[in-house]
UniProtKB/Swiss-Prot annotation:
Belongs to the metallo-dependent hydrolases superfamily. Urease alpha subunit family. Ni(2+) 1 binds at residues 136, 138, 219, 362. Disulfide bonds: none annotated. Its EC number is 3.5.1.5. The lineage of its organism: Bacteria, Pseudomonadati, Pseudomonadota, Alphaproteobacteria, Rhodobacterales. It comes from Dinoroseobacter shibae (strain DSM 16493 / NCIMB 14021 / DFL 12). Heterotrimer of UreA (gamma), UreB (beta) and UreC (alpha) subunits. Three heterotrimers associate to form the active enzyme. It holds the Pfam family Urease_alpha. It comes from the Bacteria. Carboxylation allows a single lysine to coordinate two nickel ions. This is Urease subunit alpha. Gene3D superfamilies: Metal-dependent hydrolases, Urease, subunit C, domain 1. One of its GO terms (molecular function) is nickel cation binding.
């Protein structure tokens, strides 16, 4: 006889199902389960007296007969593709199937075969997301990687060689020698990486050399001279070799204004960093580029969201990052020209409209590497409080807004950098770089992080305790973060030219190298849930921002979610 239980009892046992709602941490964001791919009465769950036992939910199938390596049961998936419940099967480090797990000998409709060789991760009452992708990294110190990983980031792309002054200010790994040494170093960490070469040159030879050495992107930075000639040259090389170009434009307008930079792009695809301008770029109107189809605009996280403290912290931050001197009036004027409350306020709104497509950190160079995910959801919450329900919502929930914001640090940077075939979403065939979250800690502290299907860190209690839960519980590295597992769980993203040249073998790299592809034949319309192209105008004296004629302004937040109550110890 079928049994009937209350929704509350069902959610406690198997997690929320279709129509149930979940609050994300202490925000005002409410998601609703859109569909449930498991089968009522045939759910699989691990534990004493539960379903995944021999002859019940566990079959006799060998791995060769199709059993998965790992099953994540009854997880609530939050992804740009939707918000739904499913079992997820992992095999060979990738997502093998999404649907209903179990034993096909005793159950119908089984998509994921559980066998004696299958490990189980309990996803009941948990949220599963794709690992985050931070596409604006200054590789200043290796300790960044641990902080990023523990926040839910599983892929980092950027440039640098350590605390050299070029790297402190610019996101570039210049030259084949440094690219090689950095790739060799990055073999050691449980994280996917890619390196950006220096793109500032008026002739192509050195740029080609860096891409052939493995650089998967090129970075144009004003501190190296982002002139129209350098922009044109770099984009020409990128078009020929299929890598992305990231740009930090000319704050001082020395070599031209924003219109000259746009003209130099000639309609070619480019990833515009910190497009609001506080992180650098044509003052005061770099934000105009948001309205162009060929520009993929991103934000760095210190201005996100706009709060009562944002302006005050930025001047000192900028002076340090760009090697400026408070005793030199011109340096002070340079710094002050970049910090504008009007454009910072408008940035929040443009994100909520889907006109800004990506959020990244700018790690240790006017950005916080461990706060990409936190600040994304703080911004989403602030915008819901200030702007209300999005017009695109179809139910009594915030599902569309949540899908828009999660795309900003998952699928959209992956598309921009030619690696969306491998990462950026929970889809069959993609790498199993995944984050499992307790909803009460969503966006703040992941419960478990997998790289290539292997657990690399998790919330863990006292190792000497009799059970795993006694305090102090905090994020600790797991077995996947040690030994040979590291090199087999994570990958290095390189150029197609570098891959063809066999740089993995020539540099003695242990990690698999994967080539970036389709970086050039994309545009703003490729940015999932974030493809709006309003005509943006910035008043040259008041700095007021208008989008399609509408004034964009909002109040600074005085209090944020995902903040102090989560970091008392």
């Amino acid at each position: 006889m079928p049994a009937t239980i209350s929704r509350a009892a069902y959610a406690d046992m198997y997690g929320p199902t279709t129509g149930d709602k979940v609050r994300l941490a202490d925000t005002d964001l409410i998601i609703e389960v859109e569909r449930d791919l498991t089968t009522y009465g045939e759910e699989v769950k691990f534990g004493g007296g539960k379903v995944i036992r021999d002859g019940m939910g566990q079959s006799q199938a060998t791995r060769a007969e199709g059993a998965v390596d790992t099953v994540i049961t009854n997880a609530l998936i939050v992804d740009h593709t939707g918000i739904y419940k499913a079992d997820v099967g992992l095999r060979d480090g990738v997502i093998a199937a999404i649907g209903k797990a179990g034993n096909p000998d005793t159950q119908t409709g089984v998509d994921i075969i559980i066998g004696p060789g299958t490990e189980a991760i309990a996803g009941e009452g948990r949220i599963l997301t794709a690992g985050g992708f931070d596409s604006h990294i200054h590789f200043i110190c290796p300790q960044q990687i641990e902080d990023a990983l523990h926040s839910g980031i599983t892929t980092m792309i950027g440039g640098g060689t350590g605390p050299a002054h070029g790297s402190l200010a610019t996101t570039c790994t210049p030259g084949a020698f440094h690219i090689g040494r950095m790739l060799q170093s990055l073999d050691a960490f449980p994280m996917n990486f890619g390196l950006a070469g220096k793109g500032n040159a008026s002739r192509p030879g050195a740029l080609v050399e860096m891409i052939e050495a493995g650089a998967c992107a090129m970075k144009l930075h004003e501190d190296w001279g982002t002139t129209p000639g350098a922009i044109d040259c770099c984009l020409s090389v990128a078009d020929d070799m299929d890598v992305q170009v990231m740009i930090h434009t000319d704050t001082l307008n020395e070599s031209g204004f924003v219109e000259n930079t746009i003209a130099a792009m000639k309609g070619r695809t480019i990833h515009a960093f910190h497009t609001e301008g506080a992180g650098g770029g044509h003052a005061p109107d770099i934000m105009k580029v948001v309205g162009f189809e060929h520009v993929l605009p991103s934000s760095t996280n210190p201005t996100m969201p706009y709060t009562v403290n944002t302006l005050e912290e930025h001047l000192d931050m900028l002076m340090v990052c760009h090697h400026l001197d408070k005793a030199i009036p011109e340096d002070v004027a340079f710094a002050e020209s970049r910090i504008r409350k009007e454009t910072i306020a408008a940035e929040d709104i443009l994100h909520d409209m889907g006109a800004f497509s990506i959020i990244a950190s700018d790690s240790q160079a006017m950005g916080r590497v461990g706060e990409v995910i936190i600040r994304t959801w703080q911004t989403a919450d602030k915008m819901k409080k200030q702007r209300g329900r999005l017009a695109e919502e179809t139910g009594d929930n915030d599902n569309f807004r949540v899908r828009r914001y999660i795309a900003k640090y998952t699928i959209n940077p992956a598309i921009a950098h030619g690696i969306s075939a491998h990462i950026g979403s929970i889809e069959v065939g993609k790498r199993a770089d995944l984050c499992l979250w307790n909803p009460a800690f969503f966006g703040v502290k992941p419960e478990m992080i997998l790289m290539g299907g292997t657990i690399v860190c998790a919330q863990m209690g006292d190792p000497n305790a009799s059970i795993p839960t006694p305090q102090p519980v905090y994020t600790r590295p797991m077995f996947g973060a040690y030994g040979r597992s590291v090199e087999n769980s994570a990958v290095l993203f390189v150029s197609q030219a570098g891959q063809a040249a066999g740089i993995g073998a020539s540099l003695g790299l242990a990690k698999q190298t994967l080539a970036v592809k389709t970086c050039r034949d994309i545009g703003k319309s490729s940015m999932v849930h974030n493809s709006a192209t309003p005509e943006v105008e910035v008043h040259p004296e008041t700095y007021e921002v208008r989008a399609d004629g509408e004034l964009l302004t909002c109040e600074p937040a005085t209090e944020l979610p995902l903040a102090q109550r989560y970091f008392m110890f």
